[in-house]
Amino acid sequence: MVYFFLYSGFRFNLYTALANKYLMEKKEIRFVVQDLNTYTRLISKGVKLKNILVIRLKNLTRHADIPELFDNIDVLSENMSYKYACKLYWSTIEFLNSLGLKSTDILFCGNGSHVQDLAIKKYQIDIKYETMFSELANIDGKTFFDPVGANCNSLFYKLQEENISELKSSYNYQRLNDWELNYVQNKKNKHIIRQAKRRSLNELLIYYVLTVLEIILLIPSYDSLRVRSGLTKVNVLRRKKYKGNLKKTNNDTKEYCSTNFMFFPLQVTNDAQVLINSDYNNVQALKYYIKMSRSMGLELVVKVHPAERNAEFINKIKEIIQEEDGVYISNRNTFELILGSKCVGVNNSTVGFEAIICGKETFFIGKTFYSKLVDPVWRYYYIYNYLINIDSFTGVTVENNIISKLNDLVKMKEKVIEHGKS
């Protein structure tokens, strides 16, 4: 059996496309959801009701607290309180227990850092099923899949630490160089980042209705958990204020003309990698690179992430920049800024990987495997041997051996385990 856990609608196209691949291989599939919007989307897509399973929030007071959830991404980003993180954790454990899982089953999950992911990993200790986590690769048409987790918690990160030389034997300098030149050119021609979108009035109405139903039916959607946790308020005036603040990022502040600058792209404030894999939040990282750029005799150009929804944070960044000489904020094409810079500084953003591809000196202050991809041999292996050729947003793929490649990742995990024993 192959299970696809959809914690929200984010991986909907990706996982439904993968499910079709497994169906073509005569595999049984089940979708596991925890929100009504995803549930109805699956039905409208023709998925049979028997193939859709719903996680319910249990009031399991007999179970112990999970102290490590205090530092979980869902708690840190205020998707839920610690109390409800514990409830979701044990509800997921109870749900997994009801499935009668076998070692031959495969569970496609989140990025490995969510509350549900931790529960799935914990339950896996006793029931040796396979897991597959996924994350954006920031390369069009490719997705990062990993049987252990994402970024610093991934098998790929472990491969770098183990430095298993035979994995890098396929390195082809010319092929990598040609790919990178083509990649940069394509990005320069059309560099589009999905923008943060505000809900329409109809979407807001549907959102409120579904959230109320989820609360009544004990379906633990992120929206309902935020309400239960007291982390959201119904405030129409705030929506109007938010709209005005967000628009302010559309123009450069304090125009810069020099090419003698360091580029610093900000990550979204609730980015999992910033919250759990860095000692610097966005504001601290900005101050770090202001100091560093000055020590290098460079100006600093900052770009707020296009998907940033925190208006208060945006205004805070602008206040800091307005008070600093030689520091600018820009909304120009990211690749234009990378290519025009002397160097690039990031926390642990994927933009750091893009800067490496562009041949720029790149600095990382957060923990990430992207910093290791300065080595072209590892970069080649990552692009050609590790990433899966399926688009994260659309689920579109141009090859038919997706399942075979995913199976190879599982075999690679076993190889690393054996390598560690030797």
Where are the regions that the model predicts?
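Catalytic donor nucleotide-activated moiety binding site of glycosyltransferases and closely related
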Residues: 287-328
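Short loop/turn segments at strand-loop or loop-helix junctions that form parts
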Residues: 33-36, 57-58, 135-136, 259-271, ...
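Leloir-type glycosyltransferase catalytic cores
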Residues: 155-207, 373-422
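A nucleotide-sugar donor-handling region in carbohydrate enzymes
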Residues: 158-272
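Active-site and donor-binding regions of nucleotide-sugar-utilizing enzymes
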Residues: 5-18, 39, 60-167, 174, ...
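A donor-sugar binding/catalytic signature common to diverse glycosyltransferases
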Residues: 9, 109-112, 116, 331-376
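N-terminal subdomain of nucleotide-sugar transferases
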Residues: 1-51
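Active-site donor-nucleotide binding/catalytic segment of nucleotide-sugar enzymes
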Residues: 255-287, 298, 302-308, 407-411
